From Swiss-Prot:
Main localization category: cytoplasm
Nucleotidyltransferase listed as a keyword: no
Protein name: Elongation factor P
Pathway info: Protein biosynthesis; polypeptide chain elongation
InterPro entries in alphabetical order: Elong-fact-P_C, NA-bd_OB-fold, Rib_uL2_dom2, Transl_elong_fac_P/YeiP, Transl_elong_KOW-like, Transl_elong_P/YeiP_cen, Transl_elong_P/YeiP_CS, Transl_elongation_fac_P
């Protein structure tokens, strides 16, 4: 854990704040007229996924947490755990469903994802997917002919079980490029 000040804040870094690990989503240095300067922060909890907003005095000490990303292959789900394999040592590592969180919507077996570790404690704090994944449509409704006056969307179930909105021309069996940050359809592959 490295001590720093609010001047060391950057988007994306992880800090220990109120006994929890948070990723800095956004920050802004504010210096109102004749008041003391402060830093407004938007932080995302790595344990709950909840986003909070808070402010601290400018120059205040913060604990910057060093994190590591290690590529791992997702193997399978076993009860309330997900089993990953280290690509270098071939060790199998169970990760609880709480730490995987929403990433499960777009995780396909045998795909490589990044496990995020707290480098000081060598503990897993989360799972990061690639920004884009290619997934197959296993179920969708048939588009109604002539219903193309506007951008019509319909629900489609992907091979991972996730349901997303797709354009009317998408059919079962199509492979789609999905943005894992937003869960939105990008293009047909």
């Amino acid at each position: 854990m490295a001590a720093g000040t609010t001047s060391d804040l950057r988007n994306g870094i992880v800090i220990r704040y109120n006994n929890d690990l948070y990723q800095v989503v956004e920050f802004q240095h504010v210096a109102p007229g004749n008041w003391r300067a402060f830093v407004r922060m938007k932080l995302k909890s790595l344990t709950t996924g909840k986003v909070i907003e808070d402010r601290v005095r400018a120059g205040a000490e913060i604990d910057i947490v060093r994190i590591e990303r290690r590529p791992m292959q997702y193997l399978y789900r076993e009860g309330d755990s997900f089993i990953f394999m280290d690509n270098d040592t071939f060790d199998q590592i169970p990760v609880s469903a709480d730490l995987v969180g929403d990433a499960v919507r777009f995780m396909k077996e045998n795909e490589t994802v990044d496990l995020v570790y707290d480098a000081e404690k060598d503990t897993i704090i989360g799972v990061e997917l690639p920004i884009f994944v290619n997934l197959k449509v296993v179920e969708t409704t048939v588009a109604v002919r002539g219903d193309t006056a506007t951008n019509v969307t319909k629900p489609a179930t992907l091979e991972t079980g996730a349901v997303i909105e797709v354009p009317a021309f998408i059919n079962e069996g199509d492979v789609l490029k999905i943005d894992t940050r937003t869960g939105e359809y990008i293009t047909r592959v």
